[in-house]
Amino acid sequence: MKKILNIDGGGVRVYFPLLILDYIEQKTGKKIIDLFDYFSGVSSSSIVLSGLLTKYSVKELLILFKNLSKVIFYRSYYYIIKSGFGLFNSKYTDNYINEALKYYFGDLKLSDVKKPLTILSYDLQESKSICFDTYNFSNDYKLWEVIRGSTSAPTYYPPYKLDSYLLVDGGIVTNNLSELNYTKSISYFGKEKEFLQLSLGTGCYKPQKPQKSGLLSWINFNSISSNAASSFETIELKNLLLNNLKYFYRLEIDLDNDIMLDDYNSFEQMEQIFNKWLENNKTTLDTICNIITE
C-alpha cells in the first residue's frame, strides 16, 4: 500500500501540521520521509515538505519555521510608509524571504528531493496552475526558487519571476491538495496500487457573526480565502474513492479565533490549541500511526 501526504498552505499556521507530524514520528519511531511515498505542498507547506525531503528533521523544522517567520514577515518603518501600509506595494518586501530561502536551501535543486513531491504554484502570465514535480520537470530549478514562487501570497509578496513564469501562491486556486495529490500518486504509481492518504489542514476559523463589509474589513482577505480553500471538501475526490484509495484521513483544527497568516507571535498559542485538539483526537492519530506502520 502506498501512503501519500499533502499539507495545506496557511502561512505561520503550517505549524499545526508540523506538530501533528512531530507526534506521528514520536509515536511510530520513524521519520516522515520513511512513512510516506508521495507528498504535495503549496505555499508555506512547500517549505516544510521540501525541508523534510532534503535535509531537515521535523524537530529542526519546528525551530526553523519560528525563526524563518520572524525574518520573512519583518517590515521596517521606512517600508511601511513607502508601501502606504501595504496599499501601494506588497505588504512585505521580498528581499528577506529570498535571502532566507537561499540560506536554508542553498543550491539544492528539484532533483535533490529524496521522495516524489509536487509543489503547486500559479502562473499569472498564462493564468493557470503550475505543478512542479520533483521527478518530472523539464528544468531542474533551484528548490528555493520553486518554493519562493509557491509562497508569493497576493498582497503579502510580489510575484516571483522564474524563466517565463510569473509565479504567485498556488493557494489562490486551492489550499487543500487532496484531489491533486491523489491524482498525481495514481499517475506515478499506477492504478493497481492501494493508497492511504493523509491530508493535513492548517487550522480553520469560521466567524460566528456577520462582519462589516467596508474596505478595512477586507484587509484580512487572504486569511479568509485561505480558510475557504482549506475547508472546501473536494466532491470530486469523494467520487474517486475507488477500491485503490483504501484509507483517507483529513485532519483539520477548528479555531475559535483567527490566526493571521503572518502572525509570528502566535506559535505558543498554536501549541496550546494543538494540545487541546490532541486530547480529543489522539485515538484517531494513533489509529493512523498504526496503519501507516503495518
Task: Report each predicted region and the residues it spans.
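C-terminal helical/tail subdomains of lipid-metabolizing enzymes
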Residues: 158, 162-164, 172-174, 189-195, ...
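Extended hydrophobic secondary-structure segments that form protein cores and membrane-embedded regions
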Residues: 4-7, 37-43, 117-121, 196-207, ...
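Surface cap/lid and interfacial helix-loop subdomains adjacent to catalytic sites
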Residues: 91-115, 210-240
